[in-house]
Amino acid sequence: MRYAKGSLVISPERDIPLLRQVRNSKFVSHHQLFELMKLGGFDHSRNSFNWRVKRLLDSGHVGICQSVYGAGSAVYRITKDGITLLEHHGQFTAVLHSNTEHLPHLSQVFHSLELNAVQLALWRANLLAGWQSEIEIASFNTISRAPYQKDYDAIVDIWIGDRKVRFALEYERILKSLKQYERIRAALEAERQIECVLYLTSGMEVLVHLVHEFQSVRKRLAFADAAAFERHLLDTVVTGRDGITARLWDVLQ
């Protein structure tokens, strides 16, 4: 089949997974996106990937964040046209769709990039069995009769031997207000579908504060520095809400 010169031909096997990843990540760097596509089995050639991204940028389905520096490569986000195209291919979410007034704010860039880095670290180590993004979780919570109590940053399935283990993941880059933590404590107490919540933090000061905020929550909680987790993964030494430390491997057993 021949196409008109300059027309954009969308590949359901290559373009749609890429657009879906950009949407679900909220923000993703060029390097991260290539690795996510490669590990997902969608694109193994960097030249092919670069060409694909350029097409989607030129067509306005993906946008580049011009004012973001320090990410190591260009940072992308989905556009309204990109969301509309995803919906045309059956990829709808209840919380980020073509009628959504505001797209994710630039203030969330480095939060999103860190979550991408965590996902990639688990994937490279062949530990990742499943990853549901905040977009997917929030969409599920909107329409489900049995929602999770919180829109977690991710719900993660990992392999421990031949067994799958699930936990909720939260990344705390900056501290929230006392009122927000009060609501979060109530949500964690009420959660029945998730047995363990792993809080990764941007530094030890945030970690210590979180342990203090959540020490009364009757839930299996673990706290760790995000950079340490990316290095050690299941061998990361985590702190419980009671201040006792253990390897994450043992906490998840």
Task: Tell where the protein language model's regions lie, with residue ranges.
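Soluble or luminal CAZymes and related metallo-dependent hydrolases
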Residues: 48, 110-114, 180
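Hydrophobic, Leu/Ile/Phe/Ala-enriched alpha-helical segments that form helix-helix packing faces
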Residues: 37, 53, 57, 86, ...
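Structural motif
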Residues: 26, 60, 126, 192-195
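Nuclease-adjacent, charged terminal/linker segments that flank catalytic cores
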Residues: 1-97, 101-102
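Active-site metal-binding core of divalent-cation-utilizing nuclease and nuclease-like domains
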Residues: 65-66, 107-110, 119-167, 173-177
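Non-catalytic C-terminal interaction segments of nucleic acid-processing enzymes
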Residues: 3, 16-19, 175-183, 190-253
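A short, highly charged nucleic-acid-interacting micro-segment common to nuclease
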Residues: 99-116
